[in-house]
Amino acid sequence: GGEPLLQMDFVTELFTLAKKEGIHTALDTAAGPYREDPEFKSQFDKLMAVTDLVLLDIKHIDEQSHKKLTGITNAYALSAARYLDSIGKPVWIRHVLVPGYTDDDKALEALADFLTSLNNIERIEVLPFHNLAAFKWKELGIKYTLAETLPPTQKRIDNARKILSRAGLVS
């Protein structure tokens, strides 16, 4: 489990074996570890050679809002998205709709603008936030800052899908 880009050698080996067996490979990543340096890029290119599809999480298009939500910049995910576009790798974008964090129209419009600039996006998934994992945080003794956050209404989900639909196929 966890972020596959932190385990690139293992995932590359696993995907290589899967491809030999004719199994389709999909990498599900938030791309937080993605870097432009030559060493990382070399490893990443090896992984992409055996990856059929990338499921890329873009938590927030605004850098400060992304940092507030995740603790890190969104520059890595956006850079990865641009690079994946440059190599023609098929990508499905996944955007978790968190009320009060990732559901404002201005940010959704900006995300749609960014995604429209890419030619490799095959699908955009709007994933409504839920609190099903709250118990895990409690068991770990870690404060869950989204514990009081309610799932988005169907109206907000439909709104996000409508805005993002101009950038591609939305589900």
Task: Place the predicted regions along the sequence by residue.
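A structural motif corresponding to the C-terminal lobe/cap of the Radical SAM core domain
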Residues: 113-116, 122, 138-163
